[in-house]
Amino acid sequence: MSDYHGPLRVGIGGPVGSGKTALMDLLCKTLRDRYQIAAITNDIYTKWDAEFLVRSGSLTQDRIVGVETGGCPHTAIREDASMNLAAVADMRAKFPDLDLVLIESGGDNLAATFSPELADLTIYVIDVAAGDKIPSKGGPGITRSDLLVINKIDLAPYVGASLDKMQIDAKRMRGERPFVMTNLKTQEGLDRIVGFIEAKGGLRAGS
């Protein structure tokens, strides 16, 4: 995919606190020795997520940019993605050999989706602590994302959530589209997300 469209662009969305930035951090650290990567984050009035990635050492600072969206964060990834498209263009100008751009949306609801003009692949992150009914609620993030990540599975016993119910509902709502159960704190399930990005996105190390 990256051969024909420039770098592969992966959009990562999900509600506030679901684990989007943690996933961005882990993906950068896991893939940075295999591919040329840049990271773009979206926040309403701050650049907190970008600053977190810099502090964490996810990538060098020049490969991380924070977009301040103002207003509704979903607008900046869907109806008017111009700020994010400009950020991608700037990164491509700085790093012509980019293989992968990770784009994190601002925290939003289940209706948030990425414009196909902005993202080649979309990953939607939800968390068990929000309740086991979340997959059954549907919405574009649940039903249409290329990969659904159900994070914080370790919290299920503490919040009375049934992981079996979440998996059954995810299968029912998504059909053949894949989902992954994760505990990003311990990196459980991370390898499956990485494998999905590489396989579905057509990435080849050293290409």
UniProtKB/Swiss-Prot annotation:
<keyword id="KW-0963">Cytoplasm</keyword>
<keyword id="KW-0547">Nucleotide-binding</keyword>
<dbReference type="InterPro" id="IPR004400">
    <property type="entry name" value="UreG"/>
</dbReference>
<comment type="similarity">
    <text>Belongs to the SIMIBI class G3E GTPase family. UreG subfamily.</text>
</comment>
<dbReference type="Pfam" id="PF02492">
    <property type="entry name" value="cobW"/>
</dbReference>
<feature type="binding site">
    <location>
        <begin position="14"/>
        <end position="21"/>
    </location>
    <ligand>
        <name>GTP</name>
    </ligand>
</feature>
<dbReference type="GO" id="GO:0005525">
    <property type="term" value="F:GTP binding"/>
</dbReference>
<comment type="subunit">
    <text>Homodimer. UreD, UreF and UreG form a complex that acts as a GTP-hydrolysis-dependent molecular chaperone, activating the urease apoprotein by helping to assemble the nickel containing metallocenter of UreC. The UreE protein probably delivers the nickel.</text>
</comment>
<keyword id="KW-0342">GTP-binding</keyword>
<keyword id="KW-0143">Chaperone</keyword>
<protein>
    <recommendedName>
        <fullName>Urease accessory protein UreG</fullName>
    </recommendedName>
</protein>
<dbReference type="GO" id="GO:0003924">
    <property type="term" value="F:GTPase activity"/>
</dbReference>
<comment type="function">
    <text>Facilitates the functional incorporation of the urease nickel metallocenter. This process requires GTP hydrolysis, probably effectuated by UreG.</text>
</comment>
<dbReference type="GO" id="GO:0043419">
    <property type="term" value="P:urea catabolic process"/>
</dbReference>
<dbReference type="InterPro" id="IPR027417">
    <property type="entry name" value="P-loop_NTPase"/>
</dbReference>
<dbReference type="GO" id="GO:0005737">
    <property type="term" value="C:cytoplasm"/>
</dbReference>
<dbReference type="GO" id="GO:0016151">
    <property type="term" value="F:nickel cation binding"/>
</dbReference>
<keyword id="KW-0996">Nickel insertion</keyword>
<dbReference type="InterPro" id="IPR003495">
    <property type="entry name" value="CobW/HypB/UreG_nucleotide-bd"/>
</dbReference>
